[in-house]
């Protein structure tokens, strides 16, 4: 699985430093961006299935204090785009069209559909 944030045609990295996180937040503040999540699976018999999931995320305009507080909290470390939608930064999201779980990490609905298409049966369920 690969996750990439796209903002104005550019990929945003996983933030590892305060400066990287600050730059990401500055770009995201008050704007829309796309989160693209690719899922690829290979069944034991070699069959393959893949899906690209696109999610549009709209951030509110962040005040200088919100920037400073979020950076001080450290939640952004190692996060694509410098934010964690499942945490404090979820409060910065005005609108989201697509897969919330894809923004957080793994697009569950789409992944389960791929698995079912390859014949996966959940544990405890009878095989027809």
Question: Residues of each region from the PLM?
Answer:
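Anionic-ligand binding patches
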Residues: 1-128
